[in-house]
Design a protein with these regions (language model features):
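Anionic-ligand binding patches
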Residues: 2-4, 11-186
């Protein structure tokens, strides 16, 4: 069995291979653009992209979308989260929005949409809980890694090298996908 993972992120491919390939599920990587719709949930975005990629490539595809959801800012739309992603500094973005706020609880939700050609996508989710730091720190990773502190840690993920940082992420979505694929193997 094989799936085509649509992403330009080598770390995502590595995680998928570590979980799926020992079970006999080959993971191929294709970097291609898909339409990233504006939606209220990461599930909707992943579903749309997986289906679009499957129709274009005529094969089973895997596509994911990730969002950082901050309890204190839950009234703000996902569009604002996306805008903050690239303005992640002490002067703008999430840190600015959280200035003076006590509740800094946050979670990453990652939706994996698996789409067999000609069928409707199935979605599997991973949730990594944590808090938002008061200031950026670290030299590893990208984007949110510099401000997101996973539960059980005291400093942002950006302070940890790749292997340690990757181990902090919840991979339940990929594990559930693996179970689904094995159960429905033809």
């Amino acid at each position: 069995m094989k799936i085509t993972y649509i992403t330009g992120n080598w770390a995502k491919v590595k995680s998928a291979k570590q979980i799926l390939e020992p079970l006999g599920i080959e993971v191929y990587n294709v970097k291609m653009g898909t339409t990233e719709i504006q939606a209220d949930t990461v599930e909707e975005v992943a579903i749309h992209s997986a289906k679009e990629a499957s129709e274009k490539l005529k094969c089973s595809t895997l596509k994911n979308d990730t969002g950082l959801f901050i309890e204190e800012l839950r009234r703000i739309s996902r569009t604002i989260y996306t805008l903050c992603r690239w303005k992640n500094s002490e002067k703008t973005g999430v840190l600015k929005l959280l200035e003076g706020k006590e509740n800094r609880k946050a979670m990453f939700i990652e939706a994996y949409a698996y789409c067999e050609y000609g069928k409707e996508p199935k979605v599997f989710k991973s949730i990594t809980k944590g808090t938002i730091a008061n200031k950026k720190s670290g030299k590893y990773g990208w984007s949110w890694d510099y401000i997101f502190i996973p539960d059980g840690y005291e400093i942002p993920m950006g302070n940890f090298p790749d292997e340690e940082r990757f181990a902090m992420w919840n991979n339940d979505g990929l594990k559930e996908l693996a179970k689904y694929l094995k159960k429905n193997e033809n």
